[in-house]
Amino acid sequence: MANITVTFTITEFCLHTGVTEEELNEIVGLGVIEPYEDDNTDWQFDDRAASVVQRALRLREELALDWPGIAVALTLLEENSRLREENRLLLQRLSRFISHP
């Protein structure tokens, strides 16, 4: 199965997500998203970056956070998700050793 990556130029990305170029520069500077790796010198972003920015915009709207706060919140949410998955896997392993009547 082919793996297709959709990329956006800066202008397309801003139009698609609703962020300004200034906000995009701040978001990239904070490490919330990174430009898509390409030989092209102009920034390009993939569809995953668009999803992250849309999630960030929801946090901004719902919690009235600034971009640095959103960066921290997204980092904590990702860590929480990773830990939940690790916990699920460990519980699955543990259940093999616990007898069920």
Curated annotation (Swiss-Prot):
InterPro entries membership: CbpM
Pfam family, one: MerR_2
Top-level taxonomic group: Bacteria
Family as reported in the entry's similarity comment: Belongs to the CbpM family.
HAMAP family linked to this entry: CbpM (MF_01155)
Role summary: Interacts with CbpA and inhibits both the DnaJ-like co-chaperone activity and the DNA binding activity of CbpA. Together with CbpA, modulates the activity of the DnaK chaperone system. Does not inhibit the co-chaperone activity of DnaJ.
Listed name of the protein: Chaperone modulatory protein CbpM
